[in-house]
């Protein structure tokens, strides 16, 4: 009918749905799943094509029926954020909540998290919780749970299995390969997201995974076991700089990025290199605040004794962080500056929670 007028009589309301109360099954272990947002808790809006947070921790847990077969699962909503919006205060919140769950419930913990900054958060919890009475396992998804190709279900079930072991440290559990077969377990301080979209996006330079999850969890590397009590030292000094060495870096750039900072991490090229004309400026900075040097490379380690510039950096007060990933080195210095302010330079080169590998040798 031409020129007909359409009137909206009412608008449909989006049903959230009631989450049924699950019966506790005797004989099954108990775990908690912390919801923090990310793709694993998102749906695709097919009108816009964009992915956005859309489901709660409870809905995520109830969407994966396989979890009911292996554990009694409690959902613990914490916040709902894209991982690029995570800040140090959120790291602190996750650590405190994990400590609370360990102390009050004795549960292993799975943290649902966006993958982009998952490695930062895993490192942050590793330093804040150096001893844990139950595992803390981060997991996420490269593709949202509503997509047929989603990796969310396998990752979540794999992480839950790890949360029921005697792993006494913070870890990440994500797809080992692009196939829906196994989940790899990565140490929280030795892991990087190395691919923007593939399922097997995570790697651990110089080490490889701590273990693999298939039907069972098989640990293939040395790991720390759970302790009687979870130890918490939460909080960070945020005023730390991370500077990447590159050919266009100038003295004025260095001064702009590091002035008023309480510490600096340099991601050097190769063995820990940075331009010769920056050495004096770095030395001036190192007189006042800690300066640590790691490498941008995903294999090998720093060695400042090989070339003249490296030896000069040591002489000017910089310290080596060896094969610590730059992002982990940043988090470590932020944590040390809050809790061990008088020993930052000394401790940056020491292996506290597995952040420095045992294979930092020159090939």
Model segments located where?
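C-terminal non-catalytic interaction/assembly regions of soluble proteins
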Residues: 1-12, 21-23, 271-363
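ATP/NTP phosphate-donor binding region
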Residues: 10-100, 280
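Short Gly/Thr/Asp-enriched flexible loops that form oxyanion-binding sites at enzyme active sites
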Residues: 111-134, 274-282
């Amino acid at each position: 009918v031409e020129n007909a007028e359409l009137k909206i009589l009412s608008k449909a309301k989006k049903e959230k749905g009631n989450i049924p109360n699950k019966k506790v099954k005797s004989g099954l272990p108990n775990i908690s799943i912390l919801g923090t947002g990310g793709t694993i808790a998102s749906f695709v809006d097919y009108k816009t094509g964009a992915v956005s947070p859309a489901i709660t921790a409870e809905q995520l847990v109830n969407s994966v029926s396989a979890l009911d077969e292996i554990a009694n699962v409690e959902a613990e909503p914490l916040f709902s954020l894209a991982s690029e919006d995570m800040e140090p205060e959120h790291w602190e919140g996750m650590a405190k909540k994990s400590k609370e769950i360990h102390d009050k419930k004795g549960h292993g913990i799975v943290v649902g998290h966006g993958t982009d900054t998952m490695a930062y958060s895993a490192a942050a919890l590793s330093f804040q919780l150096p001893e844990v009475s139950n595992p803390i396992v981060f997991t996420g998804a490269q593709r949202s749970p509503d997509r047929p190709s989603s990796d969310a279900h396998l990752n979540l079930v794999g992480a839950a299995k790890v949360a029921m072991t005697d792993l006494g440290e913070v870890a990440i559990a994500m797809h080992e390969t692009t196939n829906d077969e196994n989940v790899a377990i990565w140490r929280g301080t030795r892991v990087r997201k190395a691919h923007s979209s593939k399922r097997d996006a995570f790697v651990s330079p110089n080490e490889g995974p701590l273990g693999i999850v298939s039907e069972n969890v098989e640990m293939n590397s040395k790991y720390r076991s759970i302790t009687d009590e979870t130890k918490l030292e939460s909080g960070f000094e945020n005023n730390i700089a991370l500077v990447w060495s590159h050919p266009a870096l100038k003295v004025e750039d260095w001064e702009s990025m590091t002035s008023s900072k309480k510490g600096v991490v340099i991601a050097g090229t190769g063995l820990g290199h940075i331009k010769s004309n920056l050495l004096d400026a770095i030395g001036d900075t190192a007189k006042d605040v800690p300066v640590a040097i790691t490498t941008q490379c995903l294999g090998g380690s720093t060695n400042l004794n090989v070339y003249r510039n490296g030896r000069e950096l040591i002489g000017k007060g910089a310290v080596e962080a060896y094969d610590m990933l730059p992002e982990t080195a940043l988090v470590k210095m932020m944590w040390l500056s809050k809790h061990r302010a008088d020993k930052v330079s000394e401790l940056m080169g020491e292996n506290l929670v597995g952040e420095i590998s045992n294979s930092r040798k020159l090939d």
